[in-house]
UniProtKB/Swiss-Prot annotation:
PANTHER family registered for this protein in UniProt: SMALL-CONDUCTANCE MECHANOSENSITIVE CHANNEL
GO MF entries: mechanosensitive monoatomic ion channel activity
Taxonomic superkingdom: Archaea
Family: Belongs to the MscS (TC 1.A.23) family.
Keyword annotations from UniProtKB, A to Z: Cell membrane, Membrane, Transmembrane, Transmembrane helix
Species of provenance: Archaeoglobus fulgidus (strain ATCC 49558 / DSM 4304 / JCM 9628 / NBRC 100126 / VC-16)
Entry-linked Pfam families: MS_channel_1st, MS_channel_2nd, MS_channel_3rd
PROSITE patterns cross-referenced by the UniProt entry: UPF0003
TM annotation in the entry: 18-38, 61-81, 94-114
Protein name: Uncharacterized MscS family protein AF_1546
Protein location: Cell membrane
Cellular component GO terms held in the UniProt record: plasma membrane
Length: 283
């Protein structure tokens, strides 16, 4: 036992002993094992959610990050004093820290977005006022192609902390019309026509069932509310097609959409007419 202790306490150089070297080797071996376990589990979890090149890049950053942290932790055991280096690089470290803060935040947010998958490529979304199609979800940013054909790059930190509206996440989406008809028109007939048009459209869903009803009596019209469900991918086309068909079919059946109307009554005009009649009688 005494010989073993002497061997462990044997100084190789300076104050560094054999025991210190063994500690360094064990720590680095454990760090390597931990890094491999973490990256392996992440690869299994994200292999179907990320592009292969992006996934491999992220795993390498994590792997070598763990190794570097472990290596820095064992440097004092090798007799290396980092205090001078830290002081000399303090200002540089602060500058790099501020510069890399947003990069790290975007990287972490990107990992969470890819894991949670609130959006995917091809989805129609609205993120912080930017509406369009998701073109790509990268590690640091998300690319949106707007309806005008513009490409907008949004940092993942902003995407992750913003309210995300995904228009196609649900299989079906509802839209609504308010159709006004004249008071002289038959509201029941108008409802029957609208229901028939909806039933004839191949993409107007039967379940949930469309709803057509008189909602209120307006100043110039009887207002009929029409609520229809359609597949999210066909929602816009169905909405535009049915709106035009409802208009044309109602007009064919003599049911018109009235213009706003106002009845204006002038008290002075009535008084002037009465006075004019009296003057003519006296003459």
């Amino acid at each position: 036992m005494g010989i073993m202790i002497d061997v462990l306490n044997y100084k190789l150089y300076g104050d560094v002993t054999v025991y210190d070297i063994i500690v360094v080797i064990v720590v680095m071996a454990l760090a390597t094992i931990i890094a491999k376990l973490i990256t392996t589990n992440l690869r299994r979890a994200l292999i179907d959610k990320m592009k292969r090149d992006q996934l491999e890049l992220m795993l390498k950053v994590i792997y070598f990050g763990i190794i570097i942290v472990a290596f820095i932790a064992v440097l004092p055991a090798l007799g290396l004093d980092l205090s001078g280096l830290l002081v000399a690089g303090g200002i540089t470290g602060i500058v790099l820290g501020f510069a890399s803060q947003s990069v790290v935040a975007n990287l972490v947010s990107g990992i969470f977005l890819i894991s949670e998958k609130p959006i995917k490529i091809g989805d129609q979304v609205n993120i912080d006022g930017v509406a369009g199609f998701v073109e790509d979800v990268n590690i640091l940013s998300t690319i949106i192609r707007t309806y005008d054909g513009l490409y907008v790059r949004i940092p993942n930190e902003k995407v992750f902390t913003s309210n995300i509206t995904n228009y196609v996440a649900h299989i079906a989406r509802r839209f609504e019309y308010v159709v006004g008809i004249r008071y002289s028109d038959d509201a029941e007939k108008a409802i029957e026509i609208i229901k028939r048009i909806i039933e004839e459209h191949p993409f107007a869903l039967k379940n949930p069932e469309p709803v057509v009803f008189v909602d209120n009596l307006g100043d110039s019209s009887v207002n009929i509310v029409v609520r229809i469900w359609a597949p999210s991918t066909e929602w816009y086309n169905v909405k535009m097609e049915l709106l035009w068909k409802i208009k044309t079919e109602l007009e064919k059946n003599g049911i018109e959409i009235p213009f706003p109307q106002r009845v204006v009554w002038f008290a002075n005009e009535l008084r002037a007419n009465v006075e004019g009649k009296e003057e003519r009688r006296q003459a």
